[in-house]
C-alpha cells in the first residue's frame, strides 16, 4: 500500500513541477520579449523560481521514500 501512495505522490509532484516550470519559463520569455534590456535580471529571477518549483518534486520524492520504508 505504501508503494502505491508513493507512486501517486510522485506522479502529482512531477506533474505539478512540470506545469510550474512551464509557466515560469513562459512568463520569463514574455518579459524578455517585452523588455529585452532586462533579460539578465529576468533570467536570474527565472532560475531562482525554477529552483523553488523543483524543490516540490524533490521533497515529494523524499517523503515517498519515507512512506515506502515505513
UniProtKB/Swiss-Prot annotation:
Any GO CC annotation of this UniProt entry: plasma membrane
Record-annotated membrane-spanning stretches: 4-24, 47-67
Topology in the lipid bilayer: Multi-pass membrane protein
Principal cellular location given in the protein's record: membrane
Alphabetical list of Pfam families matching this protein: ATP-synt_C
Record-marked site positions (Reversibly protonated during proton transport): 54
Location(s), subcellular: Cell membrane
Protein's job: F(1)F(0) ATP synthase produces ATP from ADP in the presence of a proton or sodium gradient. F-type ATPases consist of two structural domains, F(1) containing the extramembraneous catalytic core and F(0) containing the membrane proton channel, linked together by a central stalk and a peripheral stalk. During catalysis, ATP synthesis in the catalytic domain of F(1) is coupled via a rotary mechanism of the central stalk subunits to proton translocation. Key component of the F(0) channel; it plays a direct role in translocation across the membrane. A homomeric c-ring of between 10-14 subunits forms the central stalk rotor element with the F(1) delta and epsilon subunits.
Name the record gives this protein: ATP synthase subunit c
Gene label: atpE
Amino acid at each position: 500500500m505504501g508503494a502505491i501512495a508513493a507512486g501517486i505522490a510522485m506522479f502529482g509532484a512531477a506533474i505539478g513541477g512540470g506545469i510550474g516550470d512551464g509557466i515560469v519559463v513562459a512568463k520569463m520569455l514574455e518579459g524578455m520579449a517585452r523588455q529585452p534590456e532586462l533579460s539578465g535580471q529576468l533570467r536570474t529571477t527565472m532560475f531562482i523560481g525554477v529552483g523553488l518549483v523543483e524543490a516540490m518534486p524533490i521533497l515529494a520524492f523524499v517523503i515517498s521514500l519515507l512512506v515506502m520504508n515505513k
